Amino acid sequence: MTTDLIDVRITRLPHSEGLPLPAYATAGAAGFDFLAAVDAPMTIAPGERVLVPTGLCIALPPAYELQVRPRSGLALKHGITLPNSPGTIDEDYRGELRIIVMNAGTEPFTVERGTRIAQGVLAPVSRLRWTEVETLDETARGEGGFGSTGH
């Protein structure tokens, strides 16, 4: 993957000391992994939601967001997902990045210090301007939704 790198400033909170910064696992990866900055193992019961700290704070450049997404391996093997996926970190947020994690599996799952718990994808943001009109253009689909175009 050939692309220009975008600088994102990052600071560590004390509970993330000793953990590596988020990193891309391969040269072609779109997402980088966030690590759990927990001091003690955290067990997530089936159906439970928890907030997992990363110990990191960032400053995104203007017109970007950071999308937080589940890791496919955790989802497939353990049912670990992010209920608000993708989560959005706005460019003006400066607090600790904490990940809302849910165990949709059937067995408890334990998050250890350094567990790769989620992935982040940097994305450009376009802002819209609403234009209120009396009617909308007609389309072949019209008002069909929720399965109206097939299964």
Curated annotation (Swiss-Prot):
Question: What is catalysed by this protein?
Answer: dUTP + H2O = dUMP + diphosphate + H(+)
The portions of this protein that span the membrane are: none
Which pathway or pathways does this protein act in? Pyrimidine metabolism; dUMP biosynthesis; dUMP from dCTP (dUTP route): step 2/2
Task: Name the cofactor(s) required for activity, per the record.
Answer: Mg(2+)
Entry's Gene Ontology BP terms: dUMP biosynthetic process; dUTP catabolic process
Keyword DNA-binding attributed: no
Quote the Pfam families the UniProt record gives.
dUTPase (PF00692)
Give residues annotated as binding substrate: 71-73, 84, 88-90
Under Gene3D superfamilies, the record lists: 2.70.40.10
Q: Which UniProt keywords apply?
A: Hydrolase, Magnesium, Metal-binding, Nucleotide metabolism
Q: InterPro entries annotated for this entry?
A: dUTPase (IPR008181), dUTPase-like (IPR029054), dUTPase-like_sf (IPR036157), dUTPase_trimeric (IPR033704)
Q: Name one GO molecular function term.
A: magnesium ion binding
Entry EC number(s): 3.6.1.23
What family name appears in the similarity comment? Answer: Belongs to the dUTPase family.
- Family annotation (HAMAP family): dUTPase_bact
Entries under PANTHER family matching the protein: DEOXYURIDINE 5'-TRIPHOSPHATE NUCLEOTIDOHYDROLASE
The entry's function note states: This enzyme is involved in nucleotide metabolism: it produces dUMP, the immediate precursor of thymidine nucleotides and it decreases the intracellular concentration of dUTP so that uracil cannot be incorporated into DNA.
Give the protein name, as stated in the record: Deoxyuridine 5'-triphosphate nucleotidohydrolase
Organism whose genome encodes this protein:
Gluconobacter oxydans (strain 621H)
What is the name of the gene encoding this protein?
dut
